[in-house]
Every structure is written in structure tokens, then in C-alpha cells.
Amino acid sequence: MSLTNEQIIEAIASKTVTEIVELISAMEEKFGVSAAAAAVAVAAGPAEVAEEKTEFDVVLAEAGANKVAVIKAVRGATGLGLKEAKDLVESAPANLKEGISKAEAEALKKELEEAGAKVEIK
């Protein structure tokens, strides 16, 4: 049975942010591509090409008012236990994940901000 584009979009829309990030990673591995948009920089003077950053760090800047929701989001994103996630959230600013793709970093930032945290991508 062949799925239509509409069915695929509906299936993706029903997934959580974490599941979508995992799907993107699996697709990148399967097809040997990157979801990050390729940027071409043309220099006016000498032939110098600016390198686009491909690895990003997600930093929890502040837990916000709803620490419980942030701890749950951190646990889901990192796989840490309850105590480790709580300690990480309370020690903000703290690195949550390092060396991840831009798409994964953006998805994680969105998920944590929805829980009430202040997040930075570096």
C-alpha cells in the first residue's frame, strides 16, 4: 500500500517533537544527507568561503517558573533519571546536549521553551 503525501503529513503531525527529531535523524542516516540547509557565501574580495556551523550546543539558561515541566522535558530529551534531570535544571545555566544538528537543537529548544524554560543554542 502506497501512502499519499497527505497521509504522511498527517502521520508526522501526530508525532511529538522528540519523535520528529528521531525521525529526522533516522532519515539523515538512511539517505546520507543533512536536514540543515546548505548556505553558500560568496566573498567580494579574496576567495574565502565562510563555513556554516554544523554542530550546535543546547544550553538551559533558566528553568523558569514551571520547574516540574522543565524537568520532565529534560528527562525526555536527555534520557537522564529524575534526580540527574532535577540537578541539571537547578544548576542552570547548563549544557543539555552538545554537538547536535541544527534541526535537533531547534526542536529541543522549542520543546523546552513550551515547558517554560529559557534556552540558548550556541
Curated annotation (Swiss-Prot):
Q: Where are the transmembrane segments?
A: none
> Pfam families from the xrefs?
Ribosomal_L12, Ribosomal_L12_N
Is-annotated flag, keyword Glycoprotein? no
One GO cellular component term, please give it. Answer: cytosolic large ribosomal subunit
Stored InterPro entries: Ribosomal_bL12 (IPR000206), Ribosomal_bL12_C (IPR013823), Ribosomal_bL12_C/ClpS-like (IPR014719), Ribosomal_bL12_oligo (IPR008932), Ribosomal_bL12_oligo_N_sf (IPR036235)
Give the matching CDD domains: Ribosomal_L7_L12
| Single Gene Ontology MF annotation | structural constituent of ribosome
| Keywords linked to the UniProt accession | Ribonucleoprotein, Ribosomal protein
Q: Which family does it belong to?
A: Belongs to the bacterial ribosomal protein bL12 family.
Q: What is this protein called?
A: Large ribosomal subunit protein bL12
* Organism whose genome encodes this protein: Histophilus somni (strain 2336) (Haemophilus somnus)
Lineage start: Bacteria, Pseudomonadati, Pseudomonadota, Gammaproteobacteria, Pasteurellales
- The gene designation is rplL
